[in-house]
Amino acid sequence: MSPPTVPPTGVDGVSAYLMKKRHTHKKQRRKPTFLTHRNIVGCRIQHGWKEGNEPVEQWKGTVLEQVSVKPTLYIIKYDGKDSVYGLELHRDKRVLALEILPERVPSPRIDSRLADSLVGKAVGHVFEGEHGKKDEWKGMVLARAPIMDTWFYITYEKDPVLYMYTLLDDYKDGDLRIIPDSNYYFPAAEQEPGEVLDSLVGKQVEHAKDDGSKRTGIFIHQVVAKPSVYFIKFDDDIHIYVYGLVKTP
């Protein structure tokens, strides 16, 4: 898991509240196809990744979503990476030789009632660190992930980015517990009776970092189970950030 990061303290006129948790007969195999601009949601992909002067890495993963308010942006879960990435796969020059793989995404049966019962809940999630030491990270289960049926979107207080884990086994094994007060660090949005809150999805956002520089981004998703919570994609970062937003006077 990535180490905790220091999150922004505010987003464009609203206060931000944090949330955060691996010599025989051979069958002829279909070769990967080089990608054209087709619908790739649900596809398994692979490509090279070249960051600055670093060596090229090979990444392989599943395309989960195409962002409706920014269609060039895709949400991807890469194998071996816990956090979810947002990339403009056809435009980002760091993405090299993008290919579709002939693999299918497995669809195992799960306990849908139990899975749905976890969504929107504040949780304590136990991870095992070095030397077998266990550490509980408090966070919130945001949604069941698309495409990959046994996975969940989740975020943590210690690191307010979007993660994906298969949580049902952890819950059954006692490594995931539900915290009764789901508003303890994600306050509910203040709302007058009958008031309909405007969605921020598609709106641009700007915030000042600690060093005085500014970063810009876009609200890409509103969490159905917690409408005061949004996913934000900043232009200078491939991670998806998660914030609970409340109106300020």
Curated annotation (Swiss-Prot):
What quaternary structure, including any partners, is listed in this protein's UniProt entry? Interacts with C11orf84/SPINDOC. Associates with chromatin.
- Note down the stretches annotated as region Tudor-like domain 3: 201-246
Instruction: List the taxonomic lineage.
Output: Eukaryota, Metazoa, Chordata, Craniata, Vertebrata
Q: Spell out the molecular function terms from Gene Ontology.
A: histone H3K4me3 reader activity; methylated histone binding
Kindly list the places in or outside the cell where this protein is found, as annotated in its UniProt entry: Cytoplasm; Nucleus
Query: Among its keywords, does the record have Nucleus?
Result: yes
State the residue spans of region: Tudor-like domain 1: 41-90
What is this protein for, i.e. what is its function? Binds to acetylated and methylated histones, including H3K4me3 and H4K20me3, probably acting as a histone reader that recognizes chromatin marks to mediate downstream cellular effects. Promotes canonical WNT signaling, and is involved in the down-regulation of cell proliferation.
Q: Name one GO biological process term.
A: negative regulation of cell population proliferation
Q: Any idea what this protein is called?
A: Spindlin-4
| Region of interest called Histone H3K4me3 and H3R8me2a binding, as start-end residue ranges on this chain | 80-85, 128, 237-239
Q: Which gene encodes it?
A: Spin4
Q: Which UniProt keywords apply?
A: Cytoplasm, Nucleus
User: The organism sits in which domain of life?
Assistant: Eukaryota
Predominant location: cytoplasm
One GO location term (cellular component): nucleus
Species in which this protein is naturally found: Mus musculus (Mouse)
